[in-house]
Amino acid sequence: MKRFGRIMFCFLPALLAFGLQQLISIPAVGLALLGGFYTKGATSIDDCMDAFLNIISTANFNAGVSAAYGTVALVVFAYWYYKKFRQTEPENVRKPFNIPVIFGILITAVGLQYITNYIVSFTAAINPHWLEYYSNLVESVGLDEPSLILVLYSVLIGPVCEELIFRGLTLKYAKRAMPFWIANLLQALLFGVFHMNMIQGVYAFVV
């Protein structure tokens, strides 16, 4: 029973992240709905709904919601990880990065970018509709013409949050309940599912 509880606890970080997304998104959509009803020139329900849909489909709206979620999630999960696991980190992990480590990270990042491109191409070849959906998603959040807020979220805040949630908290808890290789597969699977689309899900799982 205790082991089962530990396994179930592995899902808590991902579930909390999903809950935070809804907690941020629902009020934002509510404010957008109010904005639609108070839009100048909207004289009917249809006009108000059109204005509302225009608001929530803009890149700025989606970027703002993403940034708000990312900021809240970063604070929550960084505090959780610090309080629960900071003292268990090896001493060499706590030391500042040196030049060879930074250089190695940069080389790895470039290599992973190439691998990601191949994975995306392979996945899209299996089902072109997956790539079409992903392309529409990228366009809807403004990644084709990113703003400063979206760049900060996509390059810094979002990746750090995801690392804390999955390769941080989820993996740490999973290793308490199962062998490392199963724990690693579980966090990778949850990481992929969390993206809610096949293209990102596949390369998130593999990489």
Q: What residue spans do the PLM features occupy?
A:
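Short, intrinsically disordered low-complexity segments
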Residues: 2-5, 116, 166
